[in-house]
Amino acid sequence: NFTKPTENKPALLTFNEVETFLHEFGHSLHGMFANSTYESLSGTNVYWDFVELPSQIMENFAIEKDFLNTFARHYQTGENLPEELMKRMVDAANFNAAYACLRQVSFGLLDMAWYTRHTPFEGDVKEYEQKAWAKAQILPVVKDACMSTQFSHIFSGGYSAGYYSYKWAEVLDADAFSLFKQKGIFNRDVAGSFRQNILSKGGTEHPMTLYKRFRGQEPTIDALLIRNGIKN
């Protein structure tokens, strides 16, 4: 579904299309580099909150100057994408990043509040959800607003007790990519380790075991906060 060519222009990718291509390419690598005996444990057949690591880590390359300079050129002049434009793209992506982060965290808290109950719920839904996400609430509550009654992700969309995985995937991909940033985004040793310890293993071992084998530690939130401009 990428932008089609016209009579006067070739097919030119938007920034979002580049991100989408890299994302889906990451899923493809997860399948192509799979090296397990059983299909049920191969490639993307992993824990639900681990499946997006190979795809989302690839998206990080989309804002790396050294990567963009390999292909992102003006289709007529051959001029590289200006560094100032790259910076503006990153700044735009990070606009209100802290608020967006809290929004996702609040949805995760609400999801867990519903699915960690041990008794049927009887009471005011609005009051219940306001208590659930109180830890992430920074703006005044909108009167009569009720997220639970329209939260299709957790009631009919397959994310019940798993909405947290959206933000967790960001923590994983940012922390993992920080190793590429430290060693060089084209470092073959780091890439080889990611292939061997993450991509080839599928679901044959616990995700955290595989992650620590690649990263040398458990993930922290620091890399995500730095990437989003929330922390220096």
Regions found by a protein language model. Give the residues of each.
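Cation-handling catalytic/transport regions enriched in His/Asp/Glu
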Residues: N1-N232
